[in-house]
Amino acid sequence: MSERAPVVTIDGPSGAGKGTISQLLAERLGWKLLDSGAIYRVLALAAIHHNVELDNEDSLSLLAAHLDVQFITGNGLHGIKVVLEGEDVSIDIRSQECSNAASKVAAYPRVREALLRRQRAFNEAPGLIADGRDMGTVVFPNTPAKIYLTASAEERAQRRYNQLQDKGFDVNIDRLLSEIIERDDRDTNRSVAPLVPAEDALIIDTSGIGIDEVLDIALTHIQTKLPSVS
């Protein structure tokens, strides 16, 4: 599989800074953005909207193949806008109902295959920033510009704690840390598309360094691997 336009993959565990860096890179370069972590939630919401039963793999696969979704940057502190069939669903896909439904639809092999093809279809000019967990190993393995962001579990727990506190949630940082460690273990040891850096990825440990520094490191790597990028 060859890429139609330049692709930069940004992989890594939850809380490593993938979303922020991906958004900033897409805005800086004027490229399209794929937030693969939201794809299953978007599909689940589409299924709910279209009254597709969550145990109907055939219908879900067809819906996945034609999923009309966009990820729009340029929203500043509000982050990435997720648009499904022309409607802003950025908040809707974070509901518990949508989360539960996403877990169900993700279990079907044909749904996963359809969404793999749909994610690859995001590769359009002038270029794509692909944010996820297996972008460099599974979805776009042939791109030379791969980045893997990581950070200590403690650092990621603290970031998540700060985010939730800012939103007014009462959270326990020890519980957050435990959940992150458990999720890391599941993700790195799963049989299908485990969370591991691509062999040729640049690994950036974001522990203790600022967003601007991470962005500079990422841009330098991209310009080295993709000389046409300025």
UniProtKB/Swiss-Prot annotation:
Keywords: ATP-binding, Cytoplasm, Kinase, Nucleotide-binding, Transferase. HAMAP family: Cytidyl_kinase_type1. InterPro entries: Cytidylate_kin, Cytidylate_kinase_dom, P-loop_NTPase. GO terms for molecular function: ATP binding; CMP kinase activity; dCMP kinase activity. Belongs to the cytidylate kinase family. Type 1 subfamily. Pfam families: Cytidylate_kin. It is an enzyme of class 2 (transferase). It is found in: Cytoplasm. It catalyses: CMP + ATP = CDP + ADP; dCMP + ATP = dCDP + ADP. This is Cytidylate kinase. NCBIfam families: cmk. It comes from Shewanella sediminis (strain HAW-EB3). GO terms for cellular component: cytosol. GO terms for biological process: nucleobase-containing small molecule interconversion; pyrimidine nucleotide metabolic process. Its EC number is 2.7.4.25. ATP binds at residues 12-20.
